[in-house]
Structure formats: C-alpha cells, structure tokens
C-alpha cells in the first residue's frame, strides 16, 4: 500500500485491526468481519515503535506472545529462532532502551510474528534499518510469504515494494487511485520511457510531438513519451545521427506511476 503522508494508510491498517470502525462497509478476513476478538490471527508492526523501553527483550517478547494467546513454553523456542536469525541473540537479556534503533526495529518485527499470524501488517517495516539489516528483514518477509502468510505493508521504498509485492494499492486522500496486480498495472500504464546513451546531444528530441518529459542523465537522456508509436519516431530520428550506445524502451517504474497518480509534490 502506497500513498503520501496523510493518505490514509495507517488509518486503513487500524480498521483492519479492529481498532477503528469504517464509516461505511466493513473489514473482513476469510469471509468474517474483523473485530477485536479475531486479532490473534493478525500480526502488526506499527510505524511508531511501541515497545516498553525498560523491559528486557526476553520479557517483552514473552509478554506480547502471551497477549496473543501463546504459552511461555511455545514462545521461548520461537523467540530464540528469530533472535538468532536476526543476529541479536546477545540482546535477549538487555533492556529495549539499550538497543540501537535498528535492533529495536528487529525486536518489534519479532513481536509481530512470534505467534505465527495468518495476516501480517507491516507499516514502514524498513524504517531505521541499514542496508544489511534491511536485507535480513526482506528475506524474512519473503520466507513468511512462501509459508502462506498474507502480508500487507506500506513503504516509501519503491524498490522494496517492486521486489516484494504482487498486488498494489495507491491511496490519495483515502481513495484508491491505482489498485490491482503490480505486473498488470505496469503493463497497462500508457506512458513509456526511453533511455538513450551516446556521445552526441539529444536536446532536439524534447521538441518532438508526444515527448512529455526530458531528463538529462549521465551519458545520455531519459524521455517519457505518450506511447510506443512515439518511441518508434524517436528511434528513427536518433538512427539518422549514426552510432548510439544504447536505445531502450523501459517499463515505467513504480516511482513513475506514483508521481503520475499522486503528484510530484508527494514523490
């Protein structure tokens, strides 16, 4: 789920958790209305950290696991498996406030999955993580997905969304402006993008009909054009000038689609 700040992502998540009632309609999971009594099947990683800073990691995870209906004897092995996976076994007896922001985020993620939820909601899960730890978390999300967990998450990292998601919803002021399978959304996006690289100047191309954007880049240009017919015209024009190192028609990136549908002010 994507959207600018204030678009309604967190509000939607709170409705999915049964914390807020929709103004109209209802939230359902597997055909049944979601209310507070069904939240044991849901895991939630909030954008704002909600851990108790004075509690030790072990006590924190046992407490939250018990709230989800688990027995302590089941929590301990699950907790230690995740601590080992995230390379934080040494922190089991440390207080939350003694951990770095990145390691706090790992513990909060463990808290959201320790009860093996059917539905996992992740609100900006990669916040505060360096590239190495972001990769660890991403691999964990992929593994959970393979095991059958349904995952809904929001992120401002378009590369993570493209890599992890099958379906996409872009919100604007609480209303979906794009929704569907990510592959189909990209395929149906009318605008095309052309990357041209070479030693010559390509300034004259920006005046051709159908060219919507002209962007200088290292060693060449990137153009946004109305459709493939315009791309053919540009190819013919470029071919007249002789050698071109690269001419490629690209699929729109998620960043391109987001800017088109939500606006440059929010990108």
From Swiss-Prot:
The keyword Nucleotide-binding is assigned to this record: yes
InterPro entries assigned to the protein according to its UniProt record, in alphabetical order: ABC_transporter-like_ATP-bd, ABC_transporter-like_CS, ABC_transporter_ATP-binding, DrrA1-3-like_C, P-loop_NTPase
Molecular function GO labels: ATP binding; ATP hydrolysis activity
Residues engaged in binding ATP: 3-10
Domain ABC transporter residues, every copy: 2-198
Pfam families, A to Z: ABC_tran, DrrA1-3_C
Superkingdom to which the source organism belongs: Bacteria
Keywords: ATP-binding, Nucleotide-binding, Transport
Family according to the record: Belongs to the ABC transporter superfamily.
Name used for this protein in its record: Uncharacterized ABC transporter ATP-binding protein BpOF4_11395
Origin species: Alkalihalophilus pseudofirmus (strain ATCC BAA-2126 / JCM 17055 / OF4)
């Amino acid at each position: 789920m994507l959207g600018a700040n204030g678009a309604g992502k967190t509000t939607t998540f709170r409705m999915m958790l049964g914390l807020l009632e929709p103004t109209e309609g209802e939230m359902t999971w597997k055909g049944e209305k979601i209310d507070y009594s069904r939240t044991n099947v849901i895991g939630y990683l909030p954008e704002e950290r909600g851990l108790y800073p004075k509690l030790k990691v072990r006590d924190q995870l046992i407490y939250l696991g018990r709230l989800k209906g688990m027995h302590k004897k089941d929590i301990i092995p699950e907790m230690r498996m995740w601590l080992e996976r995230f390379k934080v076994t040494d922190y089991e007896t440390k207080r939350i406030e003694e951990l770095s922001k990145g390691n706090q985020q790992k513990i909060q993620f463990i808290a959201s999955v320790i009860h093996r939820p059917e539905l996992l909601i992740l609100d900006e899960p990669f916040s505060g993580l360096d590239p190495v730890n972001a990769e660890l978390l991403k691999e964990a999300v992929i593994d959970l997905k393979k095991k059958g967990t349904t995952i809904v998450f929001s992120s401002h990292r378009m590369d993570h969304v493209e890599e992890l998601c099958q379906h996409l919803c872009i919100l604007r002021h609480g209303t979906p402006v794009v929704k569907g399978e990510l592959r189909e959304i990209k395929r149906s996006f009318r605008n095309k993008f052309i990357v041209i690289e070479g030693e010559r100047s390509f300034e004259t191309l920006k005046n051709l009909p159908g060219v919507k954007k002209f962007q200088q880049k290292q060693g060449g240009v990137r153009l946004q054009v109305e459709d493939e017919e315009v791309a053919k015209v540009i190819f013919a024009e470029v071919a007249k000038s002789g050698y071109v190192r690269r001419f490629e028609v690209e699929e729109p990136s998620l960043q391109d689609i987001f800017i088109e549908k939500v606006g440059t002010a929010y990108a």
